[in-house]
From Swiss-Prot:
GO terms for biological process: translation. The keyword Membrane does not apply. Keywords: Methylation, Ribonucleoprotein, Ribosomal protein, RNA-binding, rRNA-binding, tRNA-binding. This is Small ribosomal subunit protein uS12. It comes from Cutibacterium acnes (strain DSM 16379 / KPA171202) (Propionibacterium acnes).
Length: 123
């Protein structure tokens, strides 16, 4: 507990919150071009082949972005929209690709949580 004199001299410093998506430069999303599309394995207790893409953003920064949903049509030179949001079991993956915008197709045959995966309503 500081004395009043110490508070007069120094004052209290505000906590600085760390930016979790620095590559987006304050934007909600950023456009980018896929430079590499590949699969990775997750951290220890989990086991799978997670689909990820290396994306060069319009801000000039290259990031690793997760491709959510079952199946995708992405390849090198595909234009994608990238949003923030990390994947807990993939170290270094702090961005996700928005399904159903630009060159990314929505998930086929999706019935629930359709808006998250860019899936149109089935008739």
């Amino acid at each position: 507990m500081p004395t009043i004199q110490q508070l007069v001299r120094k004052g209290r410093t505000d906590k600085i919150s760390k930016n979790k998506t620095p590559a987006l430069k304050g934007s909600p999303q950023r456009r980018g071009v896929c430079t590499r599309v590949y699969t990775t394995t997750p951290k220890k207790p989990n086991s799978a082949l997670r689909k990820v893409a290396r994306v060069r953003l319009s801000s000039g920064i290259e990031v690793t972005a997760y491709i959510p949903g079952v199946g995708h049509n992405l390849q090198e030179h595909s234009m994608v929209l990238v949003r923030g949001g990390r994947v807990k079991d993939l170290p270094g993956v702090r961005y996700k690709i928005v399904r159903g915008s630009l060159d990314t197709q929505g998930v086929k045959g999706r019935k629930q949580a359709r808006s998250r995966y860019g899936a149109k309503k089935e008739k």
